[in-house]
Amino acid sequence: MEINVQAIVIDNGSDTCKAGFVGEEAPRSEFPSIVGIDQNDKDSYVGNEAQSKRGILTLKYPIERGIITNWDDMEKIWHHAFYNELGVAPEENIVVLSESPLNPEENREKMAQIMFETFKTPAIYVENQAVFSIYNSGRMTGIVLDSGDSASHVVPVYEGLALPLATSSLGFAGCDLTDQMSLLLNDLGYNLEREIVRDIKEKLSYVSSDFLWEIDDPSLEKSYELPDGQVITIGKELLACSEGLFLPYVFFGTNLDGIDKAIYNSIMKCDVDIHNDLYGNVVLSGGSTMFPGIEYRMYKELTQLAPSTTEIVINAPPERKNSVWIGGSILGLVPNFPELCFDKEDYDEYGRL
């Protein structure tokens, strides 16, 4: 197959859609993955415009826990990404799409159907988000913890292929940490809007190296100025929020494994011959891995779980919030990339990816 057109990359996140062009270092556009409906005139708004009018719109979230659940609204988001954010005609571009590690096969087929039949794109490439993150790590083998706003997964990848039988969904993500922070702030007497709580979490929270040792340290206290000018002081809550990543059974009241134990369990499900390769490239990806201190804490916890002679390398690139998108951009630079794509002729002949 020879397709002499440019390629665009779209990372379909539950919270944020990221779109841009192959070969670039960062997405051109990032906007909320939401659709707002005006109940009076039935007009629809997407992304930032929907966010700005949220008080008068019914907001809909077409991606839940990483899985597309509303295809009509998802189509609106893709249309917005193509025409409004990037200013491109999809029929003139290869489209690279990310998908959840546990995306149902029927969802993958629906993505192809919309791209070929609605947007008339000449070819597509759909790949597991974790594989894109591995590309961004500079290696082809490793184990990925991808944690965004509403979904977290652990995915071992060997020679560029995800290993589905050892892949796991963690059952908690950034939105759950935001909920936890909201409860902690309520206990302090602060009843704040969710976006403010989220901002506090993202700007001030960090991961402790030893939670029980640090929790009562008075130097933890930090100040945050609210939109009305009031300054509030927050202390141990900043640690307790992020600690949910490692101790979800304490903070979320569940029997879920923390991110460290989930990585260990996933590795143990893989062939013993690749264990060292996986431990040697533990890749952190997604916005909910951006907490300062998470890299050292992960190393510390895995050192206690893995065999004593194991070399553990935590790969936490500073741009890891965009690792999935960047990995897709890197893939598009491979010389034989067009040959790897699924084109319209393939779709017409086989009807499925």
UniProtKB/Swiss-Prot annotation:
Keyword list, A-Z: ATP-binding, Cytoplasm, Cytoskeleton, Hydrolase, Nucleotide-binding
A Pfam entry, by short name: Actin
GO cellular component, one term: actin cytoskeleton
GO MF term set: ATP binding; hydrolase activity; myosin binding; polyphosphate kinase activity; structural constituent of cytoskeleton
Catalysed reactions, semicolon-separated: ATP + H2O = ADP + phosphate + H(+)
Summary of the function given for this chain in its UniProt record: Actins are highly conserved proteins that are involved in various types of cell motility and are ubiquitously expressed in all eukaryotic cells. Multiple isoforms are involved in various cellular functions such as cytoskeleton structure, cell mobility, chromosome movement and muscle contraction.
Family: Belongs to the actin family.
Name by which UniProt lists this protein: Putative actin-28
Species this protein is from: Dictyostelium discoideum
Gene: act28
